[in-house]
Amino acid sequence: MFGLRRNAVIGLNLYCGGASLGAGGGSPAGTRLAAEEAKARREGGGEAALLPGARVVARPPPVGAEDPDVTASAERRLLKSPGLLAVPPEEMAASAAAIMSPEEELDGCEPEVLSKRPAVLPLLERVSEAAKSSGADGSLPSTPPPPEEEDDELYRQSLEIISRYLREQATGSKDAKPLGEAGAAGRRALETLRRVGDGVQRNHETAFQGMLRKLDIKNEDDVKSFSRVMTHVFKDGVTNWGRIVTLISFGAFVAKHLKSINQESCIEPLAESITDVLVRTKRDWLVKQRGWDGFVEFFHVQDLEGGIRNVLLAFAGVAGVGAGLAYLIR
């Protein structure tokens, strides 16, 4: 065993240009041994000739240890050195970060900045978590609006916009009747929600279907679970228009499902549930963002860009990409 290990060190040292290691270090005996080993190499024995085979019996390595390749060249053994195979942690992290995340695979192209794409997959994960976090008695928490919200302008405007959008999505047709409480600002917000929300649904239909299966909404009692999901979504403290519009878009997706199973009476409670959570938990943020006016401004599309978008979507529609490509999360 010592002979094998010693010869490997000699070969590595010779390859690196260092002095050979004899039995006695720098002693004459060590010098003579190095000369004999060099002679054996020149005569064609290679690394195997350095082994005193008649005098030393190679013992098998311990269990789990790698059997040294005594016939390999010094260069080959050097390349197999464990130290050379070690990768710095920062390089490993960079390699892992380079792998495309599932979110990036949702969109075939991204004509606008990444900051406005609604993140759907994280919501799917939170739906899964929320579905497992029901109360010990199996009941779902309800979220009735505080009494003061019933007379709140932001609440009334939000409820009217969200309720109108969900009903339109369920029936498949626009309601031509003017908005009451929301007024002109609500009309602009509804138009923006139609454009952005429809695109989100088309672009992330598969993810929404998975979320709907997890919630298993079949009646009005099941609609209450949507409140728990939304509350859980905002649990991390992150609030932005992309996340809000994604939740409303998913609510519209649920409204279509309710229509398909003859549960249209649940659509209005669903709209109330969405409005309750948004206004109750995110009132300060909504006020700071100027409410629905801020929503319109955030997703505003310039006329020039709109013309370009129409051309791009004409081609994108052939590939089934959909109008949701442009609406990215902040």
UniProtKB/Swiss-Prot annotation:
Assigned GO CC terms: Bcl-2 family protein complex; cytoplasm; cytosol; membrane; mitochondrial outer membrane; mitochondrion; nucleoplasm; nucleus
Cross-link Glycyl lysine isopeptide (Lys-Gly) (interchain with G-Cter in ubiquitin) residue location(s): 116, 174, 177
Name this protein carries in UniProt: Induced myeloid leukemia cell differentiation protein Mcl-1 homolog
Site positions for Cleavage: 107-108, 137-138
Taxonomic path: Eukaryota, Metazoa, Chordata, Craniata, Vertebrata
SMART domains according to UniProt: BCL
Start and end residues of each stretch annotated as Disordered: 129-153
Annotated region (PEST-like), positions in chain: 85-155
Keyword Magnesium assigned: no
GO function terms (MF aspect): BH domain binding; BH3 domain binding; channel activity; protein dimerization activity; protein heterodimerization activity; protein-containing complex binding
